[in-house]
């Protein structure tokens, strides 16, 4: 990235965060997977960047971009946090077009000086450099879903194609998606209760799509479909998905996404259960 490197290398010390990518799509694609609200909170540490989006204190999405994804990654402080308009950020990241010509890459250098300063984006394609300044905001406290691995009751790992098919067939007239996880039959079941009646989709634990099955007790929980719907953006991009429920019925959907360079990033959705399940419908 010669132009960008020469232009700003000397100024690095004034920034609390500097991150460079040879291919901006390795960032923008992951951010699109959690873009269901306008604003996001960004957390940067030496391990990478976490971008968090929340809705109605019931659902939270986190995109993790590890430091190793970047060609250059520097964080001067222990942690750097700011809130940003995610819609504007994505518009800037695709300023040269969202689907460039084959073989053409847009390079990115992202710099943040600290509290009260804008996020600076330097984008370069074919020798042309565009500079964007995006105002940052006071970071709001994000929800702590307290989803601890020691409290996980049930966990399965599925190839994403199996869940993509299921989600495309869900009855969207149903307000809720009921998830049953059990050490015994039906093992893993997705149920909806729509205008046409109830429908169930079962996955045997020995299915070719099932990569891991660790269910300790039967759990039946309901989640608002409207809250789960945004997670299908991540599902479409992912190759595997880990589905976990804890002792409170909270749901974790962790999507493994491979970028254009074959590197792995993760997007995680947390969702709280909707209600107690009526005995007659379970």
From Swiss-Prot:
Component of the 9-1-1 cell-cycle checkpoint response complex that plays a major role in DNA repair. The 9-1-1 complex is recruited to DNA lesion upon damage by the RAD17-replication factor C (RFC) clamp loader complex. Acts then as a sliding clamp platform on DNA for several proteins involved in long-patch base excision repair (LP-BER). The keyword Lipid biosynthesis does not apply. This is Cell cycle checkpoint protein RAD1. It comes from the Eukaryota. It comes from Homo sapiens. The keyword Mitochondrion does not apply. Component of the toroidal 9-1-1 (RAD9-RAD1-HUS1) complex, composed of RAD9A, RAD1 and HUS1. The 9-1-1 complex associates with LIG1, POLB, FEN1, RAD17, HDAC1, RPA1 and RPA2. The 9-1-1 complex associates with the RAD17-RFC complex. RAD1 interacts with POLB, FEN1, HUS1, HUS1B, RAD9A and RAD9B. Interacts with DNAJC7. Interacts with RHNO1; interaction is direct. Expressed in testis, uterus, bladder, spleen, ovaries, lung, brain and muscle (at protein level). CDD domains: PCNA. Gene3D superfamilies: 3.70.10.10. Changing residue 256 to A: Reduced binding to RHNO1. Changing residue 266 to A: Reduced binding to RHNO1.
